[in-house]
Amino acid sequence: AWKRITCVIVIGLALQVVVGYVTDAVLSLLPDAAADYSELVEETGMGDTSYLAVLTTVLGAPFCEELLVRGIIFEFSLRAFNPQCRPLWKRRRRARAQDGAMVPWAAPNTWGIAAAIVLQAAIFGFMHMNWVQGCYAGAAGLVFGWVLVTTGKLRYTILLHFVFNAGSYLMGLMWFVNTPLDVAVTVAIAGFVLVEAMRLLLRSCIPAPCETDRPDYQ
């Protein structure tokens, strides 16, 4: 469990670095959009750094959004594209009352899972009600959905969302990233760390083969 938690934390921080700097780079090419977004942030108080605002952003919003998007919207999306399967975090066999036989859990197909991940990410982005936040929230939502599918546990996506939002406040510590070259190198390193952390998380979620499952070559 601790290995998974560590991977999720690293994924959240690395994802924030990648998404944050890529968003800033895109806005630097669109000065009018950047000005409109800055005005929106000022008018809505999204840049508020008071204790209450930070707690709401880091703890309250991720918890509620994960319950809604990954907990409800993703489940119904998954069932819509894969009507034969049950929720991913209920991977178990169930008995039929009429004869007591065990019915295996029907696995969703790959395209159905991918479609559900994309749909919930799109809805997650739309919920932010502006195109700047919508784009990076949608991109982050793809990773959140992947983590849910990989771990099968909603608690890991809640933790991931906590870390991702907290990372936005830690970006100010990277004062040494100034030039375009610095940004490119930082994004490349963070991207590599992100991919490696996702790979390790995937490996940690693959069950080890049982002794009875191993072929007998003797």
Model-identified regions with their sequence ranges:
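Functionally important transmembrane alpha-helices
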Residues: 121, 126, 133-189
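Juxtamembrane helix-loop-helix connectors linking adjacent transmembrane helices
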Residues: 1-64, 74-105, 109, 216
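C-terminal membrane module of polytopic membrane proteins
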Residues: 28, 162-218
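Membrane-interfacial alpha-helical segments at the cytosolic side of multi-pass membrane proteins
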Residues: 70-81, 170-175
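Alpha-helical membrane-inserting segments
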Residues: 15-27, 77, 123, 127, ...
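Membrane-interface starts of transmembrane alpha-helices
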Residues: 49-53, 104-120, 153-156, 178-182
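Alpha-helical hydrophobic membrane-insertion segments
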Residues: 2-6, 10, 14, 111-118, ...
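Active-site His/Glu-centered metal-binding helix of metallohydrolases
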Residues: 63, 67-68, 72-73, 130, ...
